[in-house]
Amino acid sequence: MKTIQSIALLSAIVAAPSVLADVEIQVPSSVDILAVNEAKPDLDGGLFSSHKTLTLPDGQNQIVFQYQLAFDKGNDREFVDSDAVIATFDATDTTLTFDLPKYRNTAEAKSGFKNLEWSLVDENQNEISVKQDKLVKDGMQIGRKYPQEAKEYNQQGGIAALAIGTTAGATAAVVQPVTLPAKIDGNAANTAEEMLYFWYEKADAETKQKFKDYVNK
């Protein structure tokens, strides 16, 4: 019976990661996410959607973004971009949205972008704590490699640097390895045991540790 329960627990964790808690950021079309936790961003949403969704793990995360606006000027459109902002924050199991200033024209935007005032707010419209800085690079701006720039920024210990040991949005957990037979003895293993080994091998280190804790109860 314990084996069957173990299979159910392990397979549920491995096969359905979407049930785990995470943080979602609703990203408006005026915000360009340039890097996430020293990596290229992966957002959900169509090319012409009014907003996209960025899903992050619970805990400390870092984003790099630009606020981009366009204004009518006669028959033309004039575009204004903010400096790249690098920001680090802690959040758990919530949905966040950007709270950004609005400007009536190009002049207002250029002036406001010199010291951009923005925030992230949760589902209750409470502003969360954010450490932020400008990710500045001299010279040519085209072709910038923002994930690499964020990594170098963190190594230098900037105001909005990720905590030491934090990469890809999650702090690596130190776990003790679980010792299991490398190969199942076909004469001894029943179907339940085979399923148990199958799901165990598919699990990541964190899930294996959770499973070990459960089995040892």
UniProtKB/Swiss-Prot annotation:
It holds the Pfam family DUF2057. Residues 1-21 form the signal peptide. It comes from the Bacteria. Keywords: Signal. InterPro entries: UPF0319. NCBIfam families: PRK04517.1. Belongs to the UPF0319 family. This is UPF0319 protein VS_II0881. It comes from Vibrio atlanticus (strain LGP32).
